């Protein structure tokens, strides 16, 4: 494969030559899996997604030009799934299954177009939202985040000359390769790329994926980025996200329905998917409450993805829960994916080795770790904690509690109501860096 001189490309690019989002497949695989279920079961549900910058010290509206942002968002709205992409989605095996996407769904997807957006500025931040049918607005999440993160990177590098850019990328590559060599030393490790949404740039994510493929071989199990999976003959990986229980909870008409929302999601999911796709994401309203009230059949699922508790602490609680239900953790799977750095991966791997099957979804610290790489002192290339969350469903506020209160989203009064219902056990505030 021909290698791209990223530094030269950055120095020479204009947005028209290098649109940030090149394809509707430039998204996370779980968005397509969730989309099929939404399309099939909830086509009449409306949902609003909103940008949330948790790194409030970074004033995005001061760093990113509004005209450039609108150009990139508008360009994304011109994209359609190509014939090649549709053939690949329809004919490829995913998680060992042929035709995981129904022909009727693919026929609908062929005409898909991202809906309109609302953009304004307030107190140095962008207010960006997407409202309409859930089966359309859901696909804005990943491209919106990728666009804003890459525009911020481009703005930071605009003052760099060719030599400074060479130094920047040389240092970043060396930093990334040093991490790769450390991971290679862990026998049986399984690493995947989960870094699309907060990546430095598309070209950089592509380089990181190629580096992992070259550097750790079969230990690199694939990528969540569908376009990169297709282009690099890799497995497309991902299951489901917090938006499903958040929407189901928002639509609940009683406290009983609200408490059952996380499990109704799993029941609906199982109608569409099975096997290795039966991965539980337990922390939308707190892992402790999820495990406390979970029906016994949840223990039959393949595994869990603990996403906001410290990985060792959160993983041990799930192992204990399995044992209490007569399940052997060695036959189960834990997928760790929350803000992982190579040190966290090493520590978690060593702790759980021999106790449970493990996989690591490596995100922002894989695809956007430029701290200390610039030839001049700056923090403008440091990654920030930027999310695009569902904030309303059919006009009702949507809430995420999380195991980490710093990651909670939603209306304050609704958060208080959810806490009364689900409880606050084991919720511990931690610094959210990415």
UniProtKB/Swiss-Prot annotation:
GO molecular function, one term: nicotinate phosphoribosyltransferase activity
Pathway(s) the chain acts in: Cofactor biosynthesis; NAD(+) biosynthesis; nicotinate D-ribonucleotide from nicotinate: step 1/1
Catalytic activity: nicotinate + 5-phospho-alpha-D-ribose 1-diphosphate + ATP + H2O = nicotinate beta-D-ribonucleotide + ADP + phosphate + diphosphate
Modified how: Transiently phosphorylated on a His residue during the reaction cycle. Phosphorylation strongly increases the affinity for substrates and increases the rate of nicotinate D-ribonucleotide production. Dephosphorylation regenerates the low-affinity form of the enzyme, leading to product release.
Membrane spanning stretches: none
EC code: 6.3.4.21
Coiled coil, from the record: none
GO terms under biological process: NAD biosynthetic process via the salvage pathway
A GO cellular-component term linked to this record: cytosol
Keyword terms of this UniProt record: Ligase, Phosphoprotein, Pyridine nucleotide biosynthesis
Residue positions, PTM Phosphohistidine: 242
Function per UniProt: Catalyzes the synthesis of beta-nicotinate D-ribonucleotide from nicotinate and 5-phospho-D-ribose 1-phosphate at the expense of ATP.
Record-stated family: Belongs to the NAPRTase family.
Name under which the protein is recorded: Nicotinate phosphoribosyltransferase
Organism lineage: Bacteria, Pseudomonadati, Pseudomonadota, Alphaproteobacteria, Hyphomicrobiales
């Amino acid at each position: 494969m021909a290698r791209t001189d990223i530094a030269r490309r950055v120095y020479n690019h204009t947005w028209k030559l290098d649109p940030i989002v090149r394809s509707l497949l430039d998204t996370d695989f779980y968005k397509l899996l969730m989309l099929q279920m939404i399309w099939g079961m909830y086509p009449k549900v409306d949902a609003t997604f909103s940008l949330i910058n948790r790194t409030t010290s970074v004033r995005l509206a001061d760093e990113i030009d509004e005209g450039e942002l609108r150009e990139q968002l508008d360009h994304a709205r011109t994209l359609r799934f190509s014939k090649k992409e549709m053939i690949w989605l329809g004919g490829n095996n995913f998680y060992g299954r042929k035709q995981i996407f129904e022909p009727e769904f693919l026929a609908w997807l062929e005409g898909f177009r991202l809906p309109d957006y609302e953009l304004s500025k307030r107190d140095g931040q962008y207010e960006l939202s997407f409202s309409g049918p859930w089966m359309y607005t859901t696909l804005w999440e990943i491209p919106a985040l990728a666009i804003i993160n890459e525009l911020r990177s481009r703005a930071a590098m605009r003052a760099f000359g060719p030599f400074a850019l060479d130094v920047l990328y040389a240092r970043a590559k060396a930093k990334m390769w040093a991490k790769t060599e450390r991971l290679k030393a862990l026998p049986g490790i399984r690493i995947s790329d989960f870094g699309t949404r907060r990546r430095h740039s598309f070209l950089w994510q592509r380089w990181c994926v190629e580096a992992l493929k070259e550097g750790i071989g079969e230990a690199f199990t694939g990528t969540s980025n569908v376009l990169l999976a297709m282009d690099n003959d890799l497995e497309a990986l991902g299951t489901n996200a917090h938006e499903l229980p958040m929407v189901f909870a928002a639509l609940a008409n009683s406290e009983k329905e609200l408490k059952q929302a996380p499990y109704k999601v799993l029941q609906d999911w199982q109608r569409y998917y099975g096997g290795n796709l039966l991965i539980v994401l337990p922390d939308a309203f707190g892992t402790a409450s999820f495990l406390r009230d979970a029906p016994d059949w949840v223990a039959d699922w393949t595994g869990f993805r603990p996403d906001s508790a410290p990985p060792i602490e959160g993983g041990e609680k799930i192992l204990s829960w399995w044992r209490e239900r007569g399940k052997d953790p060695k036959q189960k799977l834990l997928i760790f994916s929350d803000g992982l750095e190579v040190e966290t991966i090493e520590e978690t791997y060593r702790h759980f080795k021999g106790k449970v099957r493990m996989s690591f979804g490596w995100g922002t610290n894989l695809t956007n770790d430029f701290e200390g790489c610039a030839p001049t002192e700056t923090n403008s290339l440091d990654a920030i904690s930027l999310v695009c969350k569902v904030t309303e469903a059919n006009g009702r506020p949507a809430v995420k509690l999380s195991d980490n209160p710093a990651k909670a989203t939603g209306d304050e009064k609704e958060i208080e109501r959810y806490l009364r219902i689900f409880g606050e056990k084991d919720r511990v505030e931690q610094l959210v860096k990415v």
